[in-house]
């Protein structure tokens, strides 16, 4: 039976930062498309962007946690 791989957290901060950047870009693209959307679609886009903002806040908190763990020698 193969042994499970050890938990490698060494690049979590970088991965999370990339995810934050991608989410910000998705928000910007969605806002650009709103001008062509119906009022109903605009509200859906606004709601989705609010959820994206919440996700960004959670990812940034996780970045802080991962950076602190890295500083204290956890890998």
From Swiss-Prot:
Swiss-Prot/TrEMBL keywords: Sporulation
GO biological process entries: asexual sporulation; sporulation resulting in formation of a cellular spore
InterPro entries: SASP_thioredoxin-like
UniProt entry tagged with the keyword Transport: no
Expression induction or repression: Expressed only in the forespore compartment of sporulating cells.
Compartment(s): Spore core
Key word Calcium present: no
Predominant location: other
NCBIfam families to which the protein is assigned, alphabetical: SASP_tlp
Homology family: Belongs to the Tlp family.
Protein name, entry field: Small, acid-soluble spore protein Tlp
Protein species of origin: Geobacillus kaustophilus (strain HTA426)
């Amino acid at each position: 039976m193969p042994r499970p791989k050890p938990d490698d957290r060494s690049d979590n901060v970088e991965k999370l930062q990339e995810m934050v950047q991608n989410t910000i870009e998705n928000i910007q693209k969605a806002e650009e498309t709103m001008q062509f959307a119906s009022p109903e679609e605009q509200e859906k886009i606004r709601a989705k962007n609010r959820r994206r903002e919440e996700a960004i806040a959670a990812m940034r908190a996780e970045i802080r946690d991962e950076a602190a763990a890295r500083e204290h020698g956890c890998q």
